[in-house]
């Protein structure tokens, strides 16, 4: 009997959060181990399907860096990185577009199998993501200039769940590879999303990444600004994205461990949460 009561308590605990976030837009940046491990991938898809079915409005932005690197190697296309960003010449950009499109359609298929009206897009569709060249040394790597969010608003209104590949275009219709974190942040700002969640390969934000007991469960925007200069590497970039989002209309940003099964549900629908809440 006790185990049944525990299950009931879990549902009751989720109720106020389901009510609070009903009809709210939730941006999810999907990447890392949660994309590479089939069991974790299925858990993420289940979480997102449940978010949708209880009345939230999720949007997924996905990456695909490791798959792009693997395909470049398989096809003999040279792939190099500068300052953590892939140098994207025309050949590399074509490979990236192909791989990201394949990932995108697989995600659409996975969610449709769970009863969700999912639709796959890239930033070129409907001129969703207009960009310019980020750096001449990076070739076709883009910086987003404008998000034409009307198409996403119309899809959400028609009960679709958009899944977006991080590919954009410039005014001359050239194709650009864009950092998926940047895409998620830009779209969240354009739609003034209730939440932006990053699925990562870390438990969250730490005061000291060498001290696993220093995990920060919640941090205000002002505290995040103070902490940001003290953090190095990829998490510094991610924290800057969190700050940018919170300063531009996104209410809360979450840094979650995508290696933990059902981390999205644990963060959004429980009192304690999991990972780090910014804002």
Swiss-Prot record:
GO CC terms: cytoplasm
One Pfam family matching this protein: AA_kinase
UniProt subcellular location: Cytoplasm
Binding site for substrate: 64-65, 86, 177
Coiled coil: none
Source species, domain of life: Bacteria
Keyword set, alphabetical order: Amino-acid biosynthesis, Arginine biosynthesis, ATP-binding, Cytoplasm, Kinase, Nucleotide-binding, Transferase
Catalysed reactions listed for this entry: N-acetyl-L-glutamate + ATP = N-acetyl-L-glutamyl 5-phosphate + ADP
CDD domains listed in its UniProt record: AAK_NAGK-C
Residues at the site labelled Transition state stabilizer: 29, 238
Function: Catalyzes the ATP-dependent phosphorylation of N-acetyl-L-glutamate.
Cited HAMAP family: ArgB
Protein name, UniProt field: Acetylglutamate kinase
Organism field: Campylobacter jejuni (strain RM1221)
